[in-house]
Amino acid sequence: MNRIMHKSKIHRATVTEANLNYVGSITIDEDLMDAADVLENEKIQVVNNNNGARFETYVIPGPRGSGVICLNGAAARLVQPGDKVILITYGIYDDAEARQHRPTVIFLDDQNRIIADARREKAGETAPTGEA
């Protein structure tokens, strides 16, 4: 049996741009992609904390160190610059792998800089926000 498991998460990213006229996808700073174990063209779920929208797209790399989180194409209608989003990828694992798997989770501040990372989330924990 295979299981679909949470593979990685970029928590509380700040949307920097929304580009309706681009072909599609989400642009993510390549440094953040590396830290969260997200690959170019990987399917990703976007959860908008501001309006509750949940949708899927694929990832394209943005300039390293830029902090860019840009929703492109039709997805640009579901976010506004400044919105807080959670970006989640999933993997398919056999039962033994799934039982050993620990996702990669990074937490960002308001400028999309990494402030913490984790390998396991616990119910009831409040994530670091990076807000003063």
UniProtKB/Swiss-Prot annotation:
The lineage of its organism: Bacteria, Bacillati, Bacillota, Clostridia, Eubacteriales. The active site is at residues 25, 58. One of its GO terms (molecular function) is aspartate 1-decarboxylase activity. The keyword Cytoplasm applies. The modification Pyruvic acid (Ser) is found at residue 25. The gene is panD. Is synthesized initially as an inactive proenzyme, which is activated by self-cleavage at a specific serine bond to produce a beta-subunit with a hydroxyl group at its C-terminus and an alpha-subunit with a pyruvoyl group at its N-terminus. GO terms for biological process: alanine biosynthetic process; pantothenate biosynthetic process. It comes from the Bacteria. This is Aspartate 1-decarboxylase.
